[in-house]
Amino acid sequence: MKRIFLLIATNMAILLVASIVMSILGVNTSTMGGLLVFAAIFGFGGAFISLAISKWMAKKTMGCEVITTPRDNMERWLVDTVARQAEQAGIKMPEVAIYQSPELNAFATGPSKDNSLVAVSSGLLYGMTQDEIEGVLAHEVSHVANGDMVTLTLIQGVVNTFVIFAARVVASIIDNFVASNDEEGEGLGMFAYMAVVFVLDMLFGILASMIVAYFSRVREFKADAGGAQLAGKHKMIAALDRLRQGPETGAMPAQMAAFGINGKKSMAELMMSHPPLEKRIEALRAQ
């Protein structure tokens, strides 16, 4: 209950702040053009702010320890492997980090190809063979080389804009309909209007999540193919097969999960950021 209240309160606060900022900027959100500007600024603004702080957030939320000086042979091999693959892919050497988790997973993040982070879990580092780990690292380096972080940020910005714009257009239509059937012509009123906007934000947000998840799944297949080029198809398949045999991964912050090697299973495949591992293995074998 507390979480729901905080979610509603946060949404209301964002709307209030957004309205104040738009008023200061002189943008009239009562017109379609003004509303579209409002939606684009906050839709893309939020997405790009998330991208800009993605490395910092990853280090804080996942407890990533960046390897500056390798402490043992395993860490040295890890850094050397990422360096070799980054050179093959034609990108600047990413920061390499380890985070403490028993699950088999890894992720890449960062605002650009030349400012990125590749992190692996301790469970993966000490629970997989070097060939399998090399396949995982190649997948993550491929994400960076393909510019997937920026691509998904742009997609997220577009769908955010759609959600903000569409929710308020539909809410205005409902408000006008209520006003036309009300003797006093008052419409929904401020609080009812904000409640309708909140519900529509949630509904359109679910649709938007499906769209982003679809593009994420497409990028996963491409990262697998890129990983196969960097490490070899057999190592990429071996890595995915090992992940398929392992336990289901736990929760990971959405921005990191989108570029993880192993996605969380979902009853609705439409909401999955990663295709099923079986399909990914089949796609690699078919190449």
UniProtKB/Swiss-Prot annotation:
Q: Which HAMAP family match?
A: Pept_M48_protease_HtpX
Q: Name one GO molecular function term.
A: zinc ion binding
Per the UniProt record, which EC number(s) apply here? 3.4.24.-
The residues that the entry says bind Zn(2+) are H139, H143, E220
Q: Which cofactor does it need?
A: Zn(2+)
Q: Cite the InterPro entries for this sequence.
A: HtpX_protease, Pept_M48_protease_HtpX, Peptidase_M48
**Covalent S-S links between cysteines:** none
Its membrane topology is listed as: Multi-pass membrane protein
- Family as reported in the entry's similarity comment: Belongs to the peptidase M48B family.
Instruction: Note the NCBIfam families from the entry.
Output: PRK05457.1
Query: By what name is this protein known?
Result: Protease HtpX
Q: Where is the active site?
A: E140
Q: Which CDD domains match?
A: M48B_HtpX_like
